[in-house]
UniProtKB/Swiss-Prot annotation:
Zn(2+) binds at E184, H246, H263. It comes from Streptococcus gordonii (strain Challis / ATCC 35105 / BCRC 15272 / CH1 / DL1 / V288). NAD(+) binds at residues 71-76, 105-109, 129-130, 142, 151. GO terms for molecular function: 3-dehydroquinate synthase activity; metal ion binding; nucleotide binding. This is 3-dehydroquinate synthase. InterPro entries: Dehydroquinate_synthase, DHQ_synth_AroB, DHQ_synth_fam, DHQS/DOIS_N, DHQS_C.
Length: 355
């Protein structure tokens, strides 16, 4: 299956195909001339797939180097970025060469940021290996790293030259890593895709059912995201809909310590919390919070987090990228399958943090 992100200045394809990882060399040779490449990955993914990818790329005529770092959100920072810059310089990577991001969301965000800033920008592609990355972070060109103050505080908008998704690699994920990806999938059903929501409703919620439906839910999710990105590449309008649950979710990730609460888990908690308060205020329909809770719990996603520190969460929210002056744009779901933006004074976010 193939989807096109038809941006006027930089169109590219998303290829979704079981077994695609073994064909990465032939896929990339259709995008780039044989040249020098650096595969950026983490130590866990490197053990699983780096050699397989390297051999496929070398068979297609590419000269391949691999840079890996310690897996986890805690590595997504400027220290790791600087180590990557040093590695690229040592192997002599130039602007005519490229970067392959091989891994989950942390790898994709960091590798994309490195590619967009090294020598003022070199070509890169995304090969996501986690469900979260396959349905969300590998698409749309957002790159970035965390700081002690906020998640993804430093980053760029830089589109990849292509995205290659192999659903079969999900079989090597741990159960928690697989389940957390469903946080983003549930979000897509809520904000845009009623057909996806119906498919999720029919699933039994087990890890086996996720793997069985993987190709379909990845396709639906990517289709929603690529349409929104085409309409609003730089996050000024409808692309903000993709942040449903993320305002509070990012604050949870930051206050818990990066990596303690996984991204999809934090999004699930954020969706439930904002819906609970918005429903009480009449901003979302009656009963929708229970629907979200039921769907999240069915797939094993958390719907609450302890310790819930309202003051710490609020301080993290003040660094949110959706904040503008003393106000913030909060994404709500007025009905299943649609979203809107509710701009409120930043101070009012304290109400949305109350239990």
């Amino acid at each position: 299956m193939k989807l096109n992100v038809n941006l006027p200045h930089h169109p590219y394809d998303i290829v979704i195909e079981n077994g695609a990882l073994s064909q990465v060399g032939s896929w990339l040779s259709q995008l780039w001339q044989p040249q020098k490449l650096v595969v950026i990955t983490d130590n866990r993914v490197a053990r699983l797939y780096a050699e397989k990818v390297k051999l496929s790329l070398e068979a297609a005529g590419f000269k391949v180097f691999t840079f890996d770092f310690l897996e986890g959100e805690a590595s997504k920072n400027l220290t790791t970025v600087n180590k990557a810059y040093e590695f690229l310089a040592k192997v002599g990577l130039t602007r005519s060469d490229g970067i392959v991001a091989l891994g989950g969301g942390v790898v994709g965000d960091l590798a994309g940021f490195v590619a967009s800033t090294y020598m003022r920008g070199i070509h890169f592609v995304q090969i996501p290996t986690s469900l979260t990355a396959q349905v969300d972070s590998s698409i749309g060109g957002k790159t970035g790293v965390n700081t002690p103050w906020a998640k993804n505080m430093v980053g760029t908008f830089t589109q990849p030259d292509g995205v290659l998704i192999d659903p079969e690699v999900l079989h090597t994920l741990g159960q928690r890593e697989l389940i957390e990806g469903m946080g983003e999938v549930v979000k897509y059903g809520l904000i845009e895709d009623k057909e996806l929501w119906d498919e999720l409703s029919e699933m039994d919620g087990s890890p086996e059912s996720i793997l069985e439906h993987a190709e379909s839910i990845i396709y639906h999710s990517c289709d929603v995201k690529r349409k929104i990105v085409i309409e609003d590449e730089l996050d000024n309008g409808v692309r903000l809909y993709l942040n449903f649950g993320h305002t509070i979710g990012h604050a949870i990730e930051a206050t818990a310590g990066y990596g303690q609460v996984m991204h999809g888990e934090a999004v699930a908690i954020g969706m439930v919390q904002v819906s609970r308060v918005a429903e009480k205020q009449g901003l979302m329909p009656a009963g929708i919070t229970e629907d979200i809770i039921h769907m999240c719990q069915k797939f094993g996603l958390p719907v609450d987090y302890q310790p819930w520190n309202e003051n710490a969460l609020y301080q993290a929210l003040t660094h949110d990228k959706k904040a503008r002056g003393n106000s913030i744009k909060l994404v709500l779901v007025p009905e299943l399958g649609s979203a809107n933006i509710h701009q409120i004074p930043l101070e009012e976010m304290k109400e949305f943090l109350k239990k």
